[in-house]
Amino acid sequence: MNAVAPTIADRPIFVPGFFYARSDRVIAIMQPTFLPWAGYFHLIASSDTFVFLDTVQLEKQSWQTRNRILVNGTEHRVSVPLDRQTIGLPLQQAQTRPRQEWFGKMRQTLAQAYAFSPFLPHTLDCFDSAYSEGDLSLARMNAAFIAAICNLLDIATPHVHASTMKANGARSERLIAICQELNGETYLSPRGAADYLAEDGFDRLGGPALQFQDFTPAPYPQKRATGFVSHLSIIDVLCHLGPAETRAYIGATP
């Protein structure tokens, strides 16, 4: 018998978008990752401007190129193959392998994995719009998918690509420069960056106020899973909950 995970109503969800002080201008900055998890969209929804950090070096076997879904209740990794000549270049210059080598197979995997879901067409539309045509720029395709999901979830936060900005510098200096160029008063950071921000002395560099994202993904029912599998791609959340409940799940404010 499949274990039934608690529904959203069964336990509280941390919804920082509802209690962050928003009298100032909040900037969030992230690399354009591949089919990102729900927390990525919570970060976007909690900011006034979101920046795709596409000027960093592409790393092999990173979240820029891979993520996880459920297949028959079991965690399954999906990844996009890279043109080897672009590994190590800035992300905005990275290219995937020719689309015919991976797009059709990956789409079929998604379609079969979530064939049970009445929300699959909405999700595949987002995937198709980003990855089915156009150039092979990894950053462009990832950003296009993220923008399509934001549109589906009615998240209206404007997006900016760091590669179109003047800001530069290493690590924290670059983040501060981006915030300053956008007149940001608060930098909203994922908690996973806390160690390197502390190492860089972010709060002593004369930049914006630093605030950390507070998002804990609540369990939701997952078909055939024997227990809740957390931090999967937003695709899994959408296919199980649908757009309206996914919007509530990530704490997007009206």
Where are these regions (language model features)?
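Residues lining hydrophobic/aromatic ligand-binding pockets adjacent to catalytic sites
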Residues: 3, 19-254
